[in-house]
Amino acid sequence: MYIGIDHGTTSLRFAADNGKRFKMSREAAKEFTIENLQKLGPVEDIAGIALCYSMGDNFTQITPVDKLKNRGVITRDGAGEHIGGGTRVFDAVRESGIPAIAIPGIHRGSDTDPRFKIYSHQTSPEKLGIAYLVSETLGDTFIVSDISSNTVSLLIANGKVIGAFDACVFAPGTRHGALDVDAIRKVDAGEITANEAFTTAGVMYHLEEKYQNPTVAMWAAMECASLSLLAPDASIALAGSLAPELAEEISALLQKPVI
C-alpha cells in the first residue's frame, strides 16, 4: 500500500492507493501518530509514503524525507499561519521507518521560466499533485487554478512546470491575498505583521458577501488569462473548494470551457 499526504491551508489529507482517504484539521494533526494511518489499512502494509510539507522551498528534487534539511523549508515562518500539525505529521513519518519521500515546491531554485523568478516562491508542493491528476485528463499542456482560502495558478507545457502565481502575489482567495497599499501602511505603522496582512487580505474580510465569489472568479480568470500568454492553446482546469461554484463564471470570463 502506498500513501500520499497533502499539507493544505486548513487540513492535512491522507489517501491510499486502495481508494481510502481521510483528513485532519491542522490543529487536530498536532496529536498525529503513525497509527492514525490504520484508517487507510494496516500500517505494516505501507510500502511507501509521499508527502508535501509547507512551502518545500529549500530543495528542488523529489527527496527522501530523512535527507532533507529543516524539513525541506528555508524557514517555517512566512506567508501563512504556523499551527504545528504539518510539522507533527512530517516528523512522525520520518521517525516511522517507513520509506518516505517529499515533493518540492516551485521557487527560485526550480527549473522554471526565469521571468517567474522575480518572486521567491511560486507554488507549494501539493499543487504539483493537483497538476499530476489534471494531466491524466488534459495531457501535457494546461493551466490549473486552485481556488479556496487562497488562489494559486500554474502552467504546465509539454509536461514541464513553466511557472506559477503564488497566493501572495495576484488573485485573492476567501482568506488570503496580496498586500495592497493599505496593508503596507498598516505593517509599516506596526499595527499588524506582514503575515497578518496576508492572512486577512481575502475577499471575506474586505467585500460584501454578494461580491466575494464574483471577485475571486474575476481574479482567478485573470491569472489563467495571464498564463495563457505563454501557452495560448492550453486547456484550463479548476481545483479547490470554490471550483464548482465559480466554474461557470470563470468559463464565461475566459470565453472557453474549463473543467
Give the label of every model feature segment:
Residues I3-I5, D188-I259:
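ATP-binding/phosphotransfer module of carbohydrate and carboxylate kinases, centering on a glycine-rich
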Residues G19, P64-R71, A157-G163, A167, ...:
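A glycine- and small-aliphatic-rich helix-loop capping segment at beta-alpha/alpha-beta transitions
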Residues E44-C52, A100, D233-A239:
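Hydrophobic beta-strand segments of well-ordered beta-sheets in folded domains
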Residues R88, A92, G129-T137, A183-V187, ...:
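Alpha-helical scaffold segments in soluble metabolic enzymes
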Residues D111-T141, N158-Y211:
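Glycine-rich phosphate-binding loop plus the immediately following alpha-helix
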